[in-house]
Swiss-Prot record:
The keyword Mitochondrion does not apply. Keywords: Isoprene biosynthesis, Nucleotidyltransferase, Transferase. Catalyzes the formation of 4-diphosphocytidyl-2-C-methyl-D-erythritol from CTP and 2-C-methyl-D-erythritol 4-phosphate (MEP). It comes from Nitrosococcus oceani (strain ATCC 19707 / BCRC 17464 / JCM 30415 / NCIMB 11848 / C-107). It catalyses: 2-C-methyl-D-erythritol 4-phosphate + CTP + H(+) = 4-CDP-2-C-methyl-D-erythritol + diphosphate. GO terms for biological process: isopentenyl diphosphate biosynthetic process, methylerythritol 4-phosphate pathway. This is 2-C-methyl-D-erythritol 4-phosphate cytidylyltransferase. The keyword Nucleotidyltransferase applies. Its EC number is 2.7.7.60. It comes from the Bacteria. The record marks 157, 213 as: Positions MEP for the nucleophilic attack.
Length: 234
């Protein structure tokens, strides 16, 4: 019996670095909001059963969104931090999916995700014991700075990767690892870090560099460039 695939999108953040009046996932991008592009990329993939979206209890923008009546969208209440929102999303899936089903956790502010990246995750990890994540090898020179912003050292970039999403893991393993890490007070910055804390070694899978996370105002213009290139088949 083959496993099913589900997605969780934490979307309860406020995106303070965007210097905008609304959360970055609701900013306009080519006639839609950022999160509409993101959810569409996931919903268009034939292997994904449904998408759980974790939004803030004080979110006043979601109710106006195009996807509010989509039966493949499951809305849950997010938490104080990203890890809490993901945990809440996984908890809702535990009642719907099999423990061995796969879950792809994807940032709401990554609207340029390609189908090929999802395909690569599924094809590479479907028989992997603990899962993995999209990532990019670091090619730039990396500096470590002090509190004043002065360079302390140049970091050897050999073996360093920049983590991206989706990050794909077996549902029960991720849920238990994340829940226990949070309870232990571990700083969990992504799903892979929770799995690492639990003793697993996630697989790194090189993804497309245009799968950017919108963090700063200039990222919106860059995302539009990438989306238009993708529309042209580039």
């Amino acid at each position: 019996m083959s496993s099913s695939y589900w997605a969780v999108v934490p979307a309860a953040g406020v995106g303070k670095r965007m210097e905008a009046d609304i959360p970055k996932q609701y900013l306009p991008l080519m006639g839609k909001t950022v999160i509409e592009h993101t959810l569409a990329r996931l919903l268009q993939h034939p292997r994904i059963q449904a998408v759980v979206v974790a939004v803030s209890s004080e979110d006043r923008w979601w109710s106006e969104r195009l996807f509010q009546d989509n039966e493949r969208i499951i809305r849950v209440t997010g938490g104080a931090e990203r890890c809490h929102s993901v945990r809440n999303g996984l908890e809702s899936l535990m009642a719907l999916a099999a423990p061995e089903d796969w879950v792809l956790v994807h940032d709401a502010a990554r609207p340029c995700l390609r189908k090929e990246d999802i395909d690569r995750l599924i094809e590479t990890l479907h028989d992997h014991p603990m899962g993995g994540l999209l990532a990019l090898p670091i090619s730039d020179t990396v500096k470590r700075a002090d509190a004043e912003g002065s360079v302390m050292e140049t970091v050897d970039r050999k073996g360093l990767w920049r983590a991206m999403t989706p990050q794909m893991f077996p549902l029960a393993k991720l849920y238990n690892s994340l829940r226990e890490a949070i309870a232990a007070g571990v700083q969990v910055t992504d799903e892979a870090s929770a799995m690492e804390w639990a003793g697993f070694s996630p697989r790194l899978i090189e993804g497309y560099s245009d799968n950017i996370k919108i963090t700063h105002p200039q990222d919106l213009a860059q995302a539009e460039v990438f989306l238009k290139r993708q529309e042209r088949g580039e």
